């Protein structure tokens, strides 16, 4: 087998692959062995039909498709290695109609390859470090959040619903006079202002009391996942069975100790929260500075991000989002239902971020190559020890879980490249 690579405009090129007749015949033999196992012929055990009889009955061309499914992927994999290219998407294969047994076989693959960024300025970039300040109002807000998490719900007697209350409701939705699937619920605890229902639903329940009913009229979003409801007006017949309000605990020294066993008073709690918030803001400021440097270096580089790489990154982002939803007791299907969005909508929202991620990654790889930045054995060993301590595992177990150290090595190289940008930047306070 031989391969010839011709680079074209952008990140696309054509790989011409020549397969000798001997390899064609070998693929035909494999195809026959596969196909004959599925054929029952009187007088022969299953899979034992002679090749000559098979060809007389079905024709040798009946093996071509199976042979192509063997020879094309195998030859393509060898060809990209021989050509030294790195595809980033599935190839477009052409020329398979030229396949004939006993003859040399030539086909082409149009391939999108990994771009080679033309780097712009990445040293001496000017960035301003964000100031770090923690106000009393921020400390108060955090304490209020902690109090809210400890709040208890108490039933409101003969009082109207206000934002923040939880209404226990029965509801049924109608489009026109017809109820629709999924539009009915009983004893549903709905926190008013949570935004968990269709836009406009929760606001219409403010002012309603327990025991009262109300028709809530909403319009489903145009992009709602259920096509039969998208853009349509619906009426929900809602009965409020119970109204509950949050009652916050009293903030005193005893409760401060309950919130944090390491403090003895409210003042100590406030001081600790202020210190932790300051540390968090310092970390956020440092991260923002790094992000800005990386973004500037990426913007200064010239190259086109292939659509296949954007799609692959969008797939990863969608998978990550689904995993985060699962930790909250949800999944993507439920998210689409409650948000009124489809997978296509969500992918569209992620596309710009996905392209930015790929662009940044390729830029950093190019800078690392230009500056000869590598992850040393000592770097990898130190990171393995750190991870082993963090997850209470051995270094060997960590390596096994990662499937080797290649991913870790690349992560370290990228981190060192970002640090290189920081060390060579012009930073103002």
From Swiss-Prot:
Residues 164-249 form the PPIase FKBP-type domain. It catalyses: [protein]-peptidylproline (omega=180) = [protein]-peptidylproline (omega=0). GO terms for biological process: 'de novo' cotranslational protein folding; cell division; chaperone-mediated protein folding; protein transport; protein unfolding. Keywords: Cell cycle, Cell division, Chaperone, Cytoplasm, Isomerase, Rotamase. The keyword Phosphoprotein does not apply. Pfam families: FKBP_C, Trigger_C, Trigger_N. Its main location: cytoplasm. Signal peptide: none annotated. GO terms for molecular function: peptidyl-prolyl cis-trans isomerase activity; protein folding chaperone; ribosome binding. It comes from the Bacteria. It is an enzyme of class 5 (isomerase). It is found in: Cytoplasm. One of its GO terms (cellular component) is cytoplasm. InterPro entries: PPIase_dom_sf (IPR046357), PPIase_FKBP_dom (IPR001179), Trig_fac (IPR005215), Trigger_fac_C (IPR008880), Trigger_fac_C_sf (IPR037041), Trigger_fac_ribosome-bd_bac (IPR008881), Trigger_fac_ribosome-bd_sf (IPR036611), Trigger_fact/SurA_dom_sf (IPR027304). The keyword Protein biosynthesis does not apply. Its EC number is 5.2.1.8. Belongs to the FKBP-type PPIase family. Tig subfamily. Consists of 3 domains; the N-terminus binds the ribosome, the middle domain has PPIase activity, while the C-terminus has intrinsic chaperone activity on its own. PANTHER family: TRIGGER FACTOR CHAPERONE AND PEPTIDYL-PROLYL CIS/TRANS ISOMERASE (PTHR30560), TRIGGER FACTOR-LIKE PROTEIN TIG, CHLOROPLASTIC (PTHR30560:SF3). NCBIfam families: tig. Involved in protein export. Acts as a chaperone by maintaining the newly synthesized protein in an open conformation. Functions as a peptidyl-prolyl cis-trans isomerase. This is Trigger factor. It comes from Lysinibacillus sphaericus (strain C3-41).
